[in-house]
Amino acid sequence: MTKPDISEWIAKADGDYTTALRENRARKAPNYDAACFHAQQCVEKYLKAFLQKRQVPFAKTHDLGVLLDACLVHAPLLEGWRDRFEMLSQYAVLFRYPGESAEQGDAIKAVSAMKSFRTEMRSILGLEPG
């Protein structure tokens, strides 16, 4: 299997972005678990796109802190995202299985962080705000 290129990472990230927004905005039967999960996935994939662009190797991980650490050499200002990444990282698995469920407040925070980070990363990557 070949490594995905940057555009593939971004396309997958934007698919997660759209899904997170849709689930968070749903009036009838919103799926806040999915909104949180896809918000985390969007951020994860933008971090991986950044690392791929900078030709920085990275392990298969959903831990945004680990990915952030790999990014800091090239973008030290991303350190300011660490607290929000700690919140988002737990959503990679927390609400995926029985026993825990996201509430509206969780989804609002996750989607807000995702939207802000996506805007910043698109700028860093030289992409249109879209």
Residue ranges of each PLM-predicted region?
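Terminal alpha-helical segments
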Residues: 1-130
